[in-house]
Amino acid sequence: MKSFDEMTPKEIVQELDKYIVGQYEAKKAVAIAVRNRIRRQKLPEEWRKEVLPKNILMIGPTGVGKTEIARRLAQLSGSPFLKVEATRFTEVGYVGKNVDSMIRDLVEISVNMVKQEKIKEVERQAEELVEERILDALVPESKAVPVVTNPFINLITGGQQQQYTPEDRRRFRAKREEMREKLRKGELENEEIEIELEETVSPFMGIFGPGMEDLGIEITNMFSGMLPKQKKKRKMKVSEARKVLLPLEAEKLIDMDKVVQEALDRAQNRGIIFIDEIDKIAGKESAVGPDVSRQGVQRDLLPIVEGTTIMTKYGPVRTDYILFIAAGAFHVSRPSDLIPELQGRFPIRVELSPLTEEDFVRILKEPENAIIKQYQALLSTEGVELVFTEDGIREMARIAYQLNQRLENIGARRLYTVAEKVLEEISFEAPDIPEKRIVVDAEYVRRRLERIVQDEDLSAYIL
C-alpha cells in the first residue's frame, strides 16, 4: 500500500469508502483539503507561508457519518485528531472551558502519538532492560561477607564495607542465568515478585472546582519537576510487572526534547480539529439565560481558526495551518446565523444527505468494520458461527429506518440498537448453545423485535 503522502484525492476517497457508506461530496472535500497540505509542503518557503488550509463546514443530521469521516481521515493520514463539542466551551470570563484548551488538548494528543511511535522503536531494547529488572527481583544479590576496616571509615561510610568472594559471584551468576532461561521460556509468568516504582505525589489535583480543571492540570505540570518522586514497592506477578515496567524503561530511552519538537510540528502542520454541534452556538444574541455567551464563544473561536499563537506547556503553537472541520445539523439555525467573520473562515461547505433504507443495508454489510462482521467475530470466539441471510439484513435495515422515521432520527446509530436487541439472546446463551451454527433471517429478526416495534412506548425506551 502507498504511503499517505503519495495518495491521490481519488485514492483517499476509496480508502474512506471502506468504512463509510455514501457521502461522496464530504469525502471529496476532506480528501482535497488533506492533499493540499501535502502540496503545500512541496512549495518554496515564501509560498508555503501564504497557503492556508481551507476549513470545512459539514451540514447534516446526526448519525450520517460526519465525525467518522474526519476520524478515519486522521487515522489514514497519521494526523493528531481532536473532536470537541462547541457547546462545551464558554466565553472568556464565564466559568467553564475556554476555546484555547482545544489547542492544548491537540498538542497533548500529538505528544502522546509521537511518544508511542518512539517507544515502539526502542521496544526491543526496553524489553532487555525489563528482563534485567525482573531478574533483579527474582534473584536479589545475597548479602556479602563483611570486611573489618578502620572504625573511622565505618563512621563516614555508615557501616562496614562489603565484598563478595569469587565463589559468591560465580553462584550468583549461575543462578541468574538459570532464572533467565526459565523467564524466557515463560515458566515464571505467575511468580510473584516485588518491584520498586517511582511515583510523583500531586497535592494540587482535587482542589479545583468545575470549569477549572485546566488550571489544576497546568499548575500540577508546572510543579511536577519540583515535587519529590516517592519510591513505592509493589508486589505483582511477573506477567503484570512486564506490562508495568516496559513503558517506564522505554521512556528512559527516548529523547523527550525531540519528541516534543516533532509533536509540535505535527500538531501545527497536520493537526485536525473537529468542532461538532457548531449549530448550537449559532443564533441571535440573547442578553440573558443560557445563550448569553453564544456569540462570545464564536468570537473567541475566531482568532484560533484565523491563526494565532497559543501557549501550551510544551511551548507556543501556531494555529494557522491546523485544519478545522466544523459540523452541525442546523435544524433550528442556519450557517448564516454564525457571525460573518466565522462564516468566512469555513469556505468549503458540504451537505451530507440523510441515510436511506438501502444505505442501512449497505452499512450492515459493506464496511470493513460492518456491524454484522463485528458480531460474527465476537461470537466466533465462543465457537458460534453466525450467518446473516440477505432478507435478515434487509429486515434489520427496514426496522431501523422505520424507527428513525417514527421516533427521533439518529441515523446509522439506530442500527447498533436494533442489532444489539436482535442478537441479545444469542450473545447471552452463546457459551451453552449446542447448535453452533445460527442463521439470522427475516423471520428471526421479526420474532425478536415484533413486540417492541409495535409498542411505540417500548420502542422509544428500548430501541
Swiss-Prot record:
As for subcellular location, the record says: Cytoplasm
- Function of the molecule: ATPase subunit of a proteasome-like degradation complex; this subunit has chaperone activity. The binding of ATP and its subsequent hydrolysis by HslU are essential for unfolding of protein substrates subsequently hydrolyzed by HslV. HslU recognizes the N-terminal part of its protein substrates and unfolds these before they are guided to HslV for hydrolysis.
Keyword Transferase carried by entry:
no
Gene Ontology terms: cellular component: HslUV protease complex
Keyword Acetylation belongs to the record: no
Q: What is this protein called?
A: ATP-dependent protease ATPase subunit HslU
Query: Which CDD domains did the record assign?
Result: RecA-like_HslU
User: Which amino acids does the record list as binding ATP?
Assistant: V21, G63, V64, G65, K66, T67, E68, D276, E341, R413
Would you kindly state one Gene Ontology biological process term found in this protein's UniProt entry?
proteolysis involved in protein catabolic process
Source organism = Thermotoga sp. (strain RQ2)
